[in-house]
Structure formats: C-alpha cells, structure tokens
Amino acid sequence: MDEDGLPIVGSGIDLTKVPPIQQKRTVAFLNQFVVHSVQFLNRFATVCEEKLSALSLRIQQIETTLNILEAKLSSIPGLEDVKVEAQHISESNISNGHLPSQPDAQSVVVSPQSDNNSMNDGILQKEEAKSENITTVSKDPRYARYLKMVQVGVPVMAIKNKMIAEGLNPDLLETPDAPVPDGEPEAEESSDSESSFSD
C-alpha cells in the first residue's frame, strides 16, 4: 500500500468475485452503435449524392453555354486564322499560390480584324484597280450594319431573316467585297435616309 491506501501492484480487486457484464446490455450498446453508424453513413451518402447531382447539372449548363458560344463564334467568318498568344505565368507566382483568375487584356492578343483587314486590303486593291466606281457590299450602308452584326456575333440566321424582311439579299453577307447589284440607287436611298434622320 502507498500513502493513499492504494495497492502498489494491481488494483487489489479479486476479479473472480466480480459479476460478469450483462449480455443484454452489451448487445444493446452494439446495436445502438451500429444503428448510429448506419444513419450517419446514410446521411453522408445522401448529402454527397445531392452535391454531385448539383455539380452535374452545373456542368451540363456550362456545356450548353459553351456549345452556344462555339456556334456563335463559328458563324463569324475569318476567325480560323486568329492567333492567341498564351499567357506565361512565372513560376514564382505559381509557387506562392498567386494565380491570376483572368488574363490581362494586354497579354492576350487577338487579331481577327488585323487578319481580316490584311486579306481585305489585298482584295480591295485588286478590285479598286479594276473598277473604282463600283460600290461593294461592305461599303454600302444598308449591308454594312449587317456585316457589323456578324462581326459582333449575332446569329447569322437571324440576320438573314431580317435582311429578307427588309428586301435585301442575305447571300451577300458571305461576299462582302462583291459589287452591290443595284449600286447607285442604294447610295441615293442611304443619303435620303440619312437626311430623314437629320430632320
């Protein structure tokens, strides 16, 4: 015995005289543990399934939006030759965990207009040498606004339907450097329409 009256070695209890644990209580404890564990796992699985279904729905929405965007971009002529310079991220920024969320406007260079302008300049020079007085579709004010709509990304079918409603030839959208079928009257009509706006 030590100072507190406790045995130095062992508990001092004769284990042969201790009554056994009741089996019914042991079974009840085990059953309760199993039930709580199963309920927890069921709740966890349900929450995971809900989050995965929400994520799947969000991915489907993004895919649909991406398909619409690709369709709009494919309707713009001349984007096949667009060159985009990849943004170079320094390794120090990556190691520090600083990743830019959006590329800077200066780091990404998209030049569809410059490519289109260079191609159009060559074609325009040839056509100007052949005929200087012929009005092209791109110069005609009635067709120019529809060509601008195509460049902005408005769906081509909607533009063609609007052109048909206004009595214009929608096939001329694909050939902006072609001569206007009724050249001079269009210039007169456009000047009339401009004067009506100025009044």
Curated annotation (Swiss-Prot):
Swiss-Prot/TrEMBL keywords: Coiled coil
Any one GO biological process: exocytosis
Pfam families: CCDC53 (PF10152)
Listed InterPro entries: WASHC3
Cellular compartments per GO CC: WASH complex
Bias (Acidic residues): 183-192
Coiled coil (residue ranges): 47-76
Keyword Coiled coil: yes
Biased composition (Polar residues): 93-120
UniProt region (Disordered), positions on chain: 93-136, 170-199
Family per record: Belongs to the CCDC53 family.
PANTHER family found in the cross-reference section: PROTEIN AD-016-RELATED, WASH COMPLEX SUBUNIT 3
Description of how the protein assembles with itself and partners: Component of the WASH complex.
Protein name: WASH complex subunit 3
Organism: Xenopus laevis
Lineage: Eukaryota, Metazoa, Chordata, Craniata, Vertebrata
